[in-house]
Amino acid sequence: MCSNSNCYVPFFNWYWPFCGVLAIIFQTILLHLISHKSPATLDGLKIFLYNTSCVQIALITFAFLSQHRLLTNSISAAVLSLGPCSYVSPTTCFINYHVFMATSFGAGSAIAITVLFRFFVLVQNQVHTNQTYIMVLASYIAPLVVLIIPFTDKWDFESAQASTALEHPSYNLSIYYPYSGFSNAGSPQFLSATLLLSIGAYGIPIGCLILTRKVLILIRYHSHMSERTKKQAQTLIHGLIVQSMLPFISYIPSFSGYIYTQSTGRELLICEHLILVSSAFPALLDPFISFYFIVPYRQAIIEWVLPKRQQRITTVTSNSTSGFN
C-alpha cells in the first residue's frame, strides 16, 4: 500500500515520456503505411484512417503536456498537472485539460464514422467524396461543443484549491501548486460536458457494435464480392470492433474506482491517475490493431520485420504457381 499521496508520481513521471514517444513512433509508422501501402480498395477509407491517426496523435500529445491526475471533492475537483503545461500557468493546464477531453471524444467519433462509412459503402455501393468530407467534419461537432462549454463557466482556481486542501488534509499537494480545477462540479456547464462525455464513452461503442453487426451481415450476403474480398472486409470490421470497444474497456477500471471512492469515501490513489491513462491508452494501442486487422499493413510489417521469411514464402508461392501451370 502507498504510504503517501504521491507514491505513484515517480512511476507516471517515467510512464508519460515513454508512452508518448512510443505512441508517436507507432502512429508515424501507421501514417506511412496508410500513405504508401494502401491498395486501391482502401482509397475511400484512407481519409478516415488519416483522420483517426491524426486525432490520436493530438490525444497523446495533450496527455503528455498535461500529465494530470483528477482529484474529486464533494462539490469541486482539482486537476493536478505535472506535465510541461505546469511550467507555464494553471490556466494553460486547464485549457489543455479541456482540449484533451474534447480530443478524446473526437477519437471515439473518428472510429464511429469509419464504421458508418463501411455501412454506407455496402448499402449505397458508393460514397461520394463530398459525403466523406461531410462525415468527417460532422464528427467534430460534439467534441467542439464539449470544448466550448467549459469556457462559458466561471474559473475560480483559488476556491478549488481551498476546498481540495480542506477535504484532503493528508495529501501533499505542494508539488502541484498552483494548480487548476473546477470550483463548482454542480454547475450546468460541468454537468452538461460530463453528460456529453458519458454519452460518447458508452454510446459510441454500443452504437458501433450494433452497426458493425449489420455490416458483417451485409458483407456475408453481398452478391458482388468475391470470397477473398469478403474475408478482408470482415477482418477490417473485426478490427473496427476492437477499436470501438477499447475506450469502453479502458474506462471500466477508472470509472469503477471513481464509483467506489464516491460511495465509500475511501481514496484510491491509483484511480486518480488512471482516468488520464485510460483515456489516452487507445492512442498507443490502436496502431497495433490497424497493423494486424488491415491485411496489407500486416503484410508490410511482416516484410519489414522478417524479410527472409517473406522471401521464402514468395519463392514457395512462385514455385507452386509454376508447377501448377
Curated annotation (Swiss-Prot):
Locations listed in the record: Membrane
SUPFAM superfamilies reported in the protein's UniProt record: Family A G protein-coupled receptor-like
Transmembrane portions of the chain: 14-34, 45-65, 75-95, 97-117, 132-152, 190-210, 235-255, 275-295
Domain of life: Eukaryota
S-S pairs: none
Main location: membrane
A Pfam family it matches: 7TM_GPCR_Srd
Keyword DNA-binding: no
Keywords for this protein: Membrane, Transmembrane, Transmembrane helix
Gene Ontology annotations for the cellular component aspect, listed alphabetically: membrane
Lipid bilayer topology: Multi-pass membrane protein
Matches recorded under InterPro entries: 7TM_GPCR_serpentine_rcpt_Srd, Nematode_rcpt-like_delta
Family as reported in the entry's similarity comment: Belongs to the nematode receptor-like protein srd family.
UniProt name for this protein: Serpentine receptor class delta-59
Organism (species): Caenorhabditis elegans
Phylogenetic classification of the source organism: Eukaryota, Metazoa, Ecdysozoa, Nematoda, Chromadorea
